[in-house]
Design a protein with these regions (language model features):
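N-terminal small-residue-enriched
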Residues: 1-447
Length: 447
């Protein structure tokens, strides 16, 4: 991808921050990337997309705010976007909670860019697919994708705020599909070269082979080993349900009234850290506030939630750098959650379990009860019975209906390695495998 560069965004900002408003904020993106899909053990699609987006927030009469979006940085298009934002602001009721715009700031250093990933060709992604296919026997089909993306983000405010960052990302997902079983593995990194595609393929194939002819299993409460992808599903839903300042202030969060109290097992520490070396975040949020590391759960104790400028003003706090793009009705969200690893390997977690289930990942997950953090969803791509400390056989998929906070209160072991998942939200979560007692499955399937 050829970068537009900060100067190109500055040209657009000079127009968007024009006269006729009390204050203005410009948020612009440039993203480009390639995707190589494969199914039935062959490549069936190569795509390339490149997008430009710009959002202009106009403020009139002190606290009447309008936001308009466009898809071009050309001068006439930017002027049109500004005029639309001004027109919206003119008919929008005053917002007494508007905190004003962020001012200039310095941002933490972050190494987010990799030239080789930004310049990846379809042939290079195809080579990765070929290396994955080498791990597949003839009686198991391969499916999945390899994707590489490069991004620019720019923020400018009439306060003098300027923020600019470039980043790359590479992801690989591999499914192994047998006659009546399947396996799955994935990896997301900053650099394409950090993806070990053959290892992912090998993991997926082993799951499909072990899962052949899955046995029936009764619903009920089980000791489960959740692999990192399944753990991440719980984390990402908790981000949405209660780790944000708006839900906290409105009393919808499981953290409301619990700060300083033990609400999870002591083995559980959860932080949001956008600028960790293995995270996928940015050094600033979409309001231009510097990103910061926030400890949410510390050894089972509720410590804090994340804040943007609006919720921080209401709470008498400082923004933690977790604002979303305007217009934002959700409030702040932690988009780079991580559960700190423990001291047991996945093999040790399994070996310590007399009877239970191992879950590779969940899908079709959703919220049953927001305040109680009850979730439901299905197991997928590798659910196995554990007997006498060993994986005994594949079992048919199950529906879980489980209080997520309760599950993290019942953790008996935490894996010593973490993996990144990007299933639900922009950003991602990094989590280990966990061993949970009394995890509730409400129904079984026939496959």
């Amino acid at each position: 991808m050829t970068l537009l560069g900060q100067d190109r965004f500055e040209d657009a900002a000079r127009i968007a921050l024009g006269d006729g408003v009390d204050a203005a904020l410009v948020l612009a993106f440039h993203s480009a990337g390639g995707l190589t899909r494969f199914a039935s053990s062959q490549i069936h699609q190569n795509t390339w997309r490149e997008t430009v987006a710009i959002s202009v927030m106009a403020v009139v009469d002190g606290n009447r705010v309008g936001v308009a979006a466009g898809s071009s940085l050309e001068p006439d298009a930017v002027r049109s976007t500004l005029q639309a934002a001004k027109a919206i602001a003119a008919v929008t009721p005053a917002n007494p909670d508007f905190p004003g715009l962020a001012g200039p700031a310095s941002y933490p250093a972050a190494n987010l860019w990799d030239d080789a990933t930004a310049e990846t060709t379809p042939a290079e992604r195809a080579d990765g697919v070929a290396r994955a296919l080498e791990e597949f026997p003839s009686n198991i089909d391969a499916a999945g994708y390899i994707e590489t993306t490069a991004n620019e983000v720019f923020i400018a405010g009439s306060t003098g705020l300027r923020a600019y960052a470039t980043s790359t990302q590479a992801g690989c997902s591999v499914m192994a599909i047998a006659q009546n079983s399947s396996g799955f593995a994935e990896s997301v990194e900053r650099k394409l070269g950090a993806l070990d595609v053959p290892v992912l393929a090998e993991r997926a194939v082993k799951k499909a082979e072990l899962g052949r002819d899955p046995a029936d299993v009764e619903p009920g409460a089980y000791t489960v080993i959740l692999e990192p992808a399944a753990t991440s599903t719980l984390l990402q839903f908790l981000a949405f349900l209660g780790f944000g300042g708006k839900a906290f202030l409105e009393g919808r969060s499981f953290m409301t009234g619990k700060i300083g109290e033990k609400i999870m097992e002591q083995k559980i520490t959860i932080v949001d850290d956008p600028i960790a070396s293995d995270a996928l975040g940015l050094p600033f949020d979409f309001e231009g506030t510097p990103s910061s590391r926030v400890v949410l759960i510390d050894k089972g104790v509720a410590k804090d939630v994340v804040w943007d400028r609006t919720t921080a003003k209401k709470a008498g706090r400082e923004s933690t750098g977790h604002g979303l793009p305007p217009p934002n009705t959700m409030g702040p969200l932690p988009l780079n959650l991580r559960m700190e690893p423990g001291d047991q390997s996945l093999e040790q977690l399994v070996a310590s379990t007399d009877r239970g289930l191992l879950v590779t990942r969940f899908h079709y997950s959703n919220v049953v009860s927001e305040k109680e953090t009850v979730l439901t969803g299905m197991t997928r791509d590798g659910t196995f019975a554990i007997e006498d400390g060993k994986l005994a056989r594949g079992v048919k998929n199950l529906r879980f209906t489980q209080n997520a906070v309760e599950a993290l209160s019942n953790v008996e072991g935490v894996g010593d390695t973490t993996e990144t998942s990007t299933e639900l939200f922009f950003g991602g979560s990094r989590a280990p495998a966990i061993k949970v007692r009394d995890f509730k499955f409400s129904s079984a399937t026939t496959h």
